[in-house]
Design a protein with these regions (language model features):
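Short, charged amphipathic alpha-helical surface segments
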Residues: 15-71
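Class I SAM-dependent methyltransferase Rossmann-like catalytic core
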Residues: 76-96
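C-terminal helical/coil "lid" or tail adjacent to the Rossmann-like core of SAM-dependent
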Residues: 80, 272-333
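Conserved alpha-helix/loop element of class I SAM-dependent methyltransferases that forms part
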Residues: 93-111, 127
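Class I SAM-dependent methyltransferase SAM/SAH-binding core
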Residues: 115, 123-172
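A short acidic, Gly/Pro-enriched loop at the edge of an enzyme's catalytic core
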Residues: 174-187
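A short glycine-rich, Lys/Arg-flanked "PGG" loop and its adjoining helix->strand segment in the class I
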Residues: 200-215
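Conserved catalytic/acceptor-binding region of the Class I
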Residues: 217-285, 294
Length: 347
Protein backbone atom coordinates (compact mmCIF):
# COMPACT_ATOMS: atom_id res chain seq x y z
CA UNK A 1 0.00 0.00 0.00
CA UNK A 2 2.95 2.33 0.60
CA UNK A 3 3.68 2.13 -3.13
CA UNK A 4 0.40 3.92 -3.82
CA UNK A 5 1.85 7.02 -2.15
CA UNK A 6 0.12 6.66 1.22
CA UNK A 7 1.96 7.77 4.35
CA UNK A 8 2.94 5.37 7.12
CA UNK A 9 0.30 6.82 9.44
CA UNK A 10 -2.45 6.19 6.88
CA UNK A 11 -1.37 2.65 6.04
CA UNK A 12 -1.07 1.44 9.65
CA UNK A 13 -4.81 1.38 10.55
CA UNK A 14 -5.63 -0.51 7.36
CA UNK A 15 -3.10 -3.31 7.90
CA UNK A 16 -4.91 -6.41 9.08
CA UNK A 17 -8.19 -8.14 8.42
CA UNK A 18 -10.36 -5.04 8.02
CA UNK A 19 -10.75 -5.06 4.24
CA UNK A 20 -13.57 -2.50 4.41
CA UNK A 21 -11.27 -0.01 6.13
CA UNK A 22 -8.56 -0.65 3.53
CA UNK A 23 -10.99 -0.17 0.65
CA UNK A 24 -12.28 3.12 2.10
CA UNK A 25 -8.71 4.32 2.55
CA UNK A 26 -7.79 3.48 -1.04
CA UNK A 27 -10.93 5.10 -2.45
CA UNK A 28 -10.20 8.30 -0.53
CA UNK A 29 -6.61 8.17 -1.77
CA UNK A 30 -7.90 7.78 -5.34
CA UNK A 31 -9.93 10.97 -4.94
CA UNK A 32 -6.83 12.77 -3.68
CA UNK A 33 -4.87 11.53 -6.70
CA UNK A 34 -7.58 12.93 -8.97
CA UNK A 35 -7.08 16.30 -7.28
CA UNK A 36 -3.32 15.92 -7.73
CA UNK A 37 -3.70 15.21 -11.46
CA UNK A 38 -5.98 18.20 -11.88
CA UNK A 39 -3.45 20.39 -10.08
CA UNK A 40 -0.58 19.15 -12.23
CA UNK A 41 -2.56 19.72 -15.42
CA UNK A 42 -3.27 23.29 -14.37
CA UNK A 43 0.38 23.71 -13.40
CA UNK A 44 1.48 22.54 -16.85
CA UNK A 45 -0.84 25.06 -18.53
CA UNK A 46 0.38 27.92 -16.35
CA UNK A 47 3.99 27.00 -17.04
CA UNK A 48 3.40 26.93 -20.79
CA UNK A 49 1.72 30.35 -20.63
CA UNK A 50 4.52 31.77 -18.50
CA UNK A 51 7.26 30.60 -20.85
CA UNK A 52 5.35 31.84 -23.89
CA UNK A 53 4.88 35.26 -22.27
CA UNK A 54 8.53 35.49 -21.29
CA UNK A 55 9.59 34.93 -24.90
CA UNK A 56 7.16 37.56 -26.22
CA UNK A 57 9.25 40.72 -26.90
CA UNK A 58 6.18 42.90 -26.32
CA UNK A 59 5.40 41.42 -22.92
CA UNK A 60 6.86 43.22 -19.88
CA UNK A 61 9.77 44.43 -22.01
CA UNK A 62 11.02 40.88 -22.52
CA UNK A 63 11.19 40.16 -18.78
CA UNK A 64 13.74 37.41 -17.92
CA UNK A 65 12.36 33.89 -18.04
CA UNK A 66 13.06 33.25 -14.34
CA UNK A 67 11.05 36.19 -13.05
CA UNK A 68 8.16 35.63 -15.44
CA UNK A 69 7.82 31.99 -14.42
CA UNK A 70 7.91 32.95 -10.74
CA UNK A 71 5.41 35.77 -11.21
CA UNK A 72 2.94 33.73 -13.24
CA UNK A 73 2.78 30.22 -11.83
CA UNK A 74 5.56 28.94 -9.65
CA UNK A 75 4.61 30.41 -6.34
CA UNK A 76 1.11 28.94 -6.01
CA UNK A 77 -0.30 31.93 -4.11
CA UNK A 78 3.18 32.65 -2.67
CA UNK A 79 3.51 29.17 -1.12
CA UNK A 80 6.55 27.70 -2.84
CA UNK A 81 5.68 24.07 -1.99
CA UNK A 82 2.21 24.22 -3.56
CA UNK A 83 -1.23 23.10 -2.38
CA UNK A 84 -1.65 19.49 -3.47
CA UNK A 85 -2.14 16.00 -2.06
CA UNK A 86 1.52 14.96 -2.07
CA UNK A 87 2.48 18.11 -0.16
CA UNK A 88 -0.25 17.31 2.34
CA UNK A 89 1.29 13.87 2.94
CA UNK A 90 4.73 15.47 3.40
CA UNK A 91 3.41 17.93 5.99
CA UNK A 92 1.67 15.13 7.85
CA UNK A 93 4.83 12.98 7.89
CA UNK A 94 6.80 16.01 9.10
CA UNK A 95 4.38 16.70 11.94
CA UNK A 96 4.41 13.10 13.17
CA UNK A 97 8.18 12.69 12.90
CA UNK A 98 8.96 15.94 14.72
CA UNK A 99 6.05 15.97 17.18
CA UNK A 100 8.01 15.37 20.38
CA UNK A 101 10.98 17.49 19.34
CA UNK A 102 8.85 20.54 18.55
CA UNK A 103 5.78 20.18 20.75
CA UNK A 104 6.81 18.32 23.92
CA UNK A 105 6.76 21.61 25.84
CA UNK A 106 3.81 23.21 24.03
CA UNK A 107 1.25 23.24 26.82
CA UNK A 108 -1.90 25.33 27.25
CA UNK A 109 -4.43 25.05 30.12
CA UNK A 110 -7.86 23.58 29.43
CA UNK A 111 -10.29 26.30 28.43
CA UNK A 112 -7.59 28.41 26.76
CA UNK A 113 -8.55 30.21 23.58
CA UNK A 114 -5.84 29.19 21.10
CA UNK A 115 -5.43 30.51 17.54
CA UNK A 116 -3.29 28.72 14.95
CA UNK A 117 -2.31 31.11 12.17
CA UNK A 118 -1.73 29.40 8.81
CA UNK A 119 -2.88 25.91 9.82
CA UNK A 120 -2.48 24.49 6.30
CA UNK A 121 -3.66 20.88 6.12
CA UNK A 122 -4.01 20.57 9.90
CA UNK A 123 -0.86 18.54 10.52
CA UNK A 124 0.19 20.68 13.49
CA UNK A 125 -3.42 21.22 14.62
CA UNK A 126 -3.79 17.52 15.44
CA UNK A 127 -0.68 17.67 17.63
CA UNK A 128 -1.86 20.79 19.44
CA UNK A 129 -5.18 19.16 20.32
CA UNK A 130 -3.65 15.84 21.33
CA UNK A 131 -1.25 17.52 23.74
CA UNK A 132 -3.65 20.14 25.08
CA UNK A 133 -7.03 18.58 25.87
CA UNK A 134 -9.81 21.01 26.57
CA UNK A 135 -8.47 23.99 24.62
CA UNK A 136 -10.73 26.02 22.33
CA UNK A 137 -8.80 25.91 19.04
CA UNK A 138 -9.42 28.20 16.09
CA UNK A 139 -7.43 27.61 12.89
CA UNK A 140 -7.18 30.03 9.99
CA UNK A 141 -5.69 29.68 6.53
CA UNK A 142 -6.05 31.47 3.19
CA UNK A 143 -6.55 28.21 1.25
CA UNK A 144 -10.06 26.72 1.21
CA UNK A 145 -8.64 23.45 -0.13
CA UNK A 146 -6.17 23.19 2.76
CA UNK A 147 -8.94 23.89 5.26
CA UNK A 148 -11.07 21.10 3.77
CA UNK A 149 -8.13 18.73 4.12
CA UNK A 150 -7.55 19.92 7.67
CA UNK A 151 -11.20 19.31 8.52
CA UNK A 152 -11.00 15.76 7.22
CA UNK A 153 -7.80 15.07 9.12
CA UNK A 154 -9.22 16.44 12.37
CA UNK A 155 -12.38 14.37 11.91
CA UNK A 156 -10.40 11.18 11.28
CA UNK A 157 -8.37 11.82 14.43
CA UNK A 158 -11.59 12.32 16.41
CA UNK A 159 -10.37 15.57 17.90
CA UNK A 160 -12.45 18.04 19.87
CA UNK A 161 -14.46 20.54 17.80
CA UNK A 162 -12.28 23.09 16.01
CA UNK A 163 -13.23 26.35 14.32
CA UNK A 164 -11.77 26.40 10.79
CA UNK A 165 -11.87 29.87 9.25
CA UNK A 166 -10.72 31.01 5.82
CA UNK A 167 -9.02 34.34 6.41
CA UNK A 168 -5.97 36.34 5.41
CA UNK A 169 -3.62 37.09 8.29
CA UNK A 170 -2.95 40.54 6.87
CA UNK A 171 -6.67 41.40 7.24
CA UNK A 172 -6.57 40.76 11.00
CA UNK A 173 -7.56 41.66 13.62
CA UNK A 174 -11.14 42.02 12.46
CA UNK A 175 -13.26 44.92 13.64
CA UNK A 176 -15.63 42.53 15.40
CA UNK A 177 -16.45 38.86 15.83
CA UNK A 178 -14.29 35.80 16.46
CA UNK A 179 -11.05 37.33 15.16
CA UNK A 180 -11.19 40.75 16.78
CA UNK A 181 -8.39 42.26 18.87
CA UNK A 182 -7.42 40.64 22.19
CA UNK A 183 -9.60 37.57 21.53
CA UNK A 184 -7.06 34.84 22.29
CA UNK A 185 -4.93 33.59 25.17
CA UNK A 186 -2.36 31.95 22.92
CA UNK A 187 -1.34 32.19 19.26
CA UNK A 188 0.66 29.48 17.48
CA UNK A 189 2.54 29.92 14.18
CA UNK A 190 4.31 26.89 12.67
CA UNK A 191 6.28 27.06 9.41
CA UNK A 192 4.44 30.15 8.17
CA UNK A 193 6.72 33.17 8.62
CA UNK A 194 9.29 31.67 6.24
CA UNK A 195 6.83 32.14 3.37
CA UNK A 196 5.78 35.73 4.14
CA UNK A 197 7.26 38.87 2.60
CA UNK A 198 6.31 40.88 5.71
CA UNK A 199 6.83 38.66 8.78
CA UNK A 200 7.19 41.71 11.01
CA UNK A 201 3.68 42.85 10.02
CA UNK A 202 2.33 39.33 10.61
CA UNK A 203 3.83 39.26 14.11
CA UNK A 204 2.37 42.67 14.91
CA UNK A 205 -1.08 41.38 13.93
CA UNK A 206 -0.57 38.24 16.00
CA UNK A 207 0.28 40.42 19.02
CA UNK A 208 -2.89 42.46 18.55
CA UNK A 209 -4.98 39.27 18.48
CA UNK A 210 -3.64 38.31 21.91
CA UNK A 211 -4.91 39.54 25.24
CA UNK A 212 -2.35 41.33 27.40
CA UNK A 213 -0.17 38.63 28.94
CA UNK A 214 -1.09 36.07 26.28
CA UNK A 215 1.64 34.03 24.65
CA UNK A 216 2.93 33.56 21.13
CA UNK A 217 4.63 30.33 20.03
CA UNK A 218 6.54 30.36 16.74
CA UNK A 219 8.36 27.41 15.14
CA UNK A 220 10.44 27.88 11.99
CA UNK A 221 13.18 26.07 10.13
CA UNK A 222 16.57 27.27 8.93
CA UNK A 223 17.71 25.73 5.65
CA UNK A 224 21.16 27.24 6.15
CA UNK A 225 21.66 24.88 9.09
CA UNK A 226 21.56 21.80 6.85
CA UNK A 227 24.64 19.57 7.06
CA UNK A 228 25.12 16.02 5.89
CA UNK A 229 27.47 13.17 5.00
CA UNK A 230 28.38 12.12 2.37
CA UNK A 231 28.76 15.74 1.32
CA UNK A 232 27.63 16.55 -2.20
CA UNK A 233 27.74 19.65 -4.38
CA UNK A 234 24.77 18.34 -6.35
CA UNK A 235 22.71 17.96 -3.17
CA UNK A 236 23.60 21.48 -2.01
CA UNK A 237 22.69 22.81 -5.46
CA UNK A 238 19.26 21.12 -5.33
CA UNK A 239 18.60 22.65 -1.90
CA UNK A 240 19.71 26.01 -3.28
CA UNK A 241 16.97 25.78 -5.93
CA UNK A 242 14.39 25.68 -3.14
CA UNK A 243 16.11 28.52 -1.30
CA UNK A 244 16.28 30.75 -4.38
CA UNK A 245 12.64 30.15 -5.30
CA UNK A 246 11.54 30.92 -1.76
CA UNK A 247 13.58 34.12 -1.64
CA UNK A 248 12.23 35.16 -5.04
CA UNK A 249 8.74 34.78 -3.58
CA UNK A 250 9.66 37.18 -0.79
CA UNK A 251 10.17 34.49 1.85
CA UNK A 252 13.15 33.69 4.05
CA UNK A 253 14.20 30.02 4.23
CA UNK A 254 16.67 30.88 7.03
CA UNK A 255 14.18 32.79 9.19
CA UNK A 256 14.62 30.52 12.22
CA UNK A 257 17.81 32.31 13.22
CA UNK A 258 15.96 35.67 13.14
CA UNK A 259 13.11 34.83 15.51
CA UNK A 260 14.53 36.63 18.55
CA UNK A 261 15.01 40.03 16.87
CA UNK A 262 11.74 39.68 14.95
CA UNK A 263 9.65 39.04 18.06
CA UNK A 264 11.47 41.63 20.13
CA UNK A 265 10.96 44.30 17.48
CA UNK A 266 7.27 43.36 17.16
CA UNK A 267 6.65 44.37 20.78
CA UNK A 268 6.74 41.03 22.58
CA UNK A 269 8.50 40.64 25.92
CA UNK A 270 10.23 37.72 27.64
CA UNK A 271 11.27 36.30 24.27
CA UNK A 272 12.90 32.88 24.60
CA UNK A 273 14.29 31.00 21.60
CA UNK A 274 15.59 27.43 21.69
CA UNK A 275 17.23 25.48 18.86
CA UNK A 276 15.71 22.07 18.11
CA UNK A 277 18.25 19.99 16.21
CA UNK A 278 17.27 16.96 14.18
CA UNK A 279 20.29 14.67 14.08
CA UNK A 280 20.10 11.47 12.04
CA UNK A 281 22.60 8.65 11.63
CA UNK A 282 22.51 4.89 11.17
CA UNK A 283 21.24 4.40 14.71
CA UNK A 284 18.02 6.32 13.92
CA UNK A 285 16.39 4.53 10.95
CA UNK A 286 13.00 5.96 11.95
CA UNK A 287 14.28 9.53 11.53
CA UNK A 288 16.12 8.60 8.35
CA UNK A 289 12.80 7.51 6.86
CA UNK A 290 10.48 10.04 8.48
CA UNK A 291 12.61 13.16 8.27
CA UNK A 292 15.43 12.77 5.74
CA UNK A 293 13.49 10.86 3.07
CA UNK A 294 9.84 11.78 3.59
CA UNK A 295 10.19 15.33 4.93
CA UNK A 296 13.33 17.19 3.90
CA UNK A 297 14.21 15.41 0.65
CA UNK A 298 10.53 15.30 -0.34
CA UNK A 299 10.34 19.06 0.24
CA UNK A 300 13.33 19.72 -2.02
CA UNK A 301 12.11 17.26 -4.67
CA UNK A 302 8.77 19.06 -4.66
CA UNK A 303 10.25 22.14 -6.36
CA UNK A 304 11.72 20.18 -9.29
CA UNK A 305 9.18 21.45 -11.84
CA UNK A 306 9.48 25.17 -11.00
CA UNK A 307 13.26 24.92 -10.58
CA UNK A 308 13.70 23.46 -14.07
CA UNK A 309 11.18 25.90 -15.56
CA UNK A 310 13.07 28.81 -14.03
CA UNK A 311 16.38 27.56 -15.41
CA UNK A 312 17.90 27.06 -11.95
CA UNK A 313 19.02 23.52 -12.76
CA UNK A 314 18.90 20.79 -15.36
CA UNK A 315 16.88 17.63 -14.86
CA UNK A 316 20.08 15.57 -14.70
CA UNK A 317 21.73 17.80 -12.09
CA UNK A 318 18.62 18.19 -9.94
CA UNK A 319 17.90 14.46 -9.90
CA UNK A 320 21.54 13.76 -9.01
CA UNK A 321 21.17 16.10 -6.04
CA UNK A 322 18.05 14.31 -4.84
CA UNK A 323 19.78 10.94 -5.21
CA UNK A 324 22.71 12.21 -3.14
CA UNK A 325 20.39 13.56 -0.45
CA UNK A 326 18.82 10.12 -0.17
CA UNK A 327 22.28 8.62 0.38
CA UNK A 328 22.51 10.57 3.64
CA UNK A 329 19.60 8.47 4.94
CA UNK A 330 21.49 5.21 4.44
CA UNK A 331 23.09 3.32 7.32
CA UNK A 332 26.45 5.06 6.85
CA UNK A 333 24.95 8.51 6.25
CA UNK A 334 24.50 11.47 8.60
CA UNK A 335 22.02 14.36 8.39
CA UNK A 336 21.49 17.39 10.60
CA UNK A 337 18.95 20.22 10.51
CA UNK A 338 17.98 22.82 13.11
CA UNK A 339 14.54 24.25 13.83
CA UNK A 340 14.00 27.20 16.17
CA UNK A 341 11.14 27.57 18.63
CA UNK A 342 10.30 30.94 20.13
CA UNK A 343 7.89 31.67 22.98
CA UNK A 344 7.04 35.25 23.97
CA UNK A 345 4.49 37.27 25.91
CA UNK A 346 2.24 40.01 24.54
CA UNK A 347 2.69 43.25 26.43
Amino acid sequence: MRRTGLSLAEVAPAVGDDQVCAEQLLRRHLRELDVELTWRSALRDRLADALASARDPDHHAAVPVLMEVIRTMVLQQDYVHGYHAQEGHRLNDQAQTLADLLHADTRFPAGSRVLELGCGVGAQSVELLARNPGIELTCIDTSAESLRTAGGRLERNKTAPVRLVQADLYDLPAAEGLLKSASFDHVVICFVLEHLNAPDDALDRARRLLRSGGTLTVIEGDHGSTAFHPDSRAAHAAIDCLVRLQRAAGGDPDIGRRLYPLLSTAGFRDVRVTPRQVYVDGSHPDLAEGFVRRTFTAMVAGVRTPALAAGLSTAEDFDAGIADLLLTAEADGVFSYTFYKAVAVAA
